[in-house]
């Protein structure tokens, strides 16, 4: 019943982040999981798996706005000059910093999307994975060099999400950067 649903919300707000840290799940993570759970309930109601839509009785878990840290130009230069254990991570991350493209779009990038302007400069055409909009972004010579040699398949082939944990953190630390930096999703 509805009491069980409330227990799930209470659990999320008190759930451990992992068994290793013992820290609670961040409220924004709990809000995201709760929202997904509410969507499942709505789908079950819409598909007539349950008779009532309990979402009208359930409170949302409010997320907290977060401040993202950014790299300064000096830090970006330092990072570019610092060796990284995963070369494809280094190229993809720096390309993202220079172009503003999301990680999801960079992972899918192919050479067919890289085109010259009439002035000889290059641009990248992407269908934003999140918004489905087609966007033409000019890219700098520095960003173009990060693409490497022209080839078939994905430009940043081998770039994996798991690289954003240990390898990215170690690379940032090696460059003397202690800010909490993430890859734009």
Question: Where in the sequence are the language-model features?
Answer:
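Active-site-proximal segment of tyrosine recombinases
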Residues: 105-107, 180-185
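Short helix/loop segment immediately N-terminal to the Walker
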Residues: 16-25, 178-181
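Short, small-residue-biased leader/transition segments that mark boundaries at the very start
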Residues: 1-6
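Alpha-helix C-caps/helix-loop-beta hinges
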Residues: 40-43, 47, 112
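Basic, Lys/Arg- and aromatic-enriched nucleic-acid-binding interface segment
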Residues: 23-35, 46, 50-103, 107, ...
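Basic, Lys/Arg-rich DNA-contacting stretches centered on the C-terminal catalytic core
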Residues: 19-22, 61-70, 82-84, 104, ...
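Active-site/catalytic core of tyrosine-dependent DNA strand-transfer enzymes
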Residues: 138-179
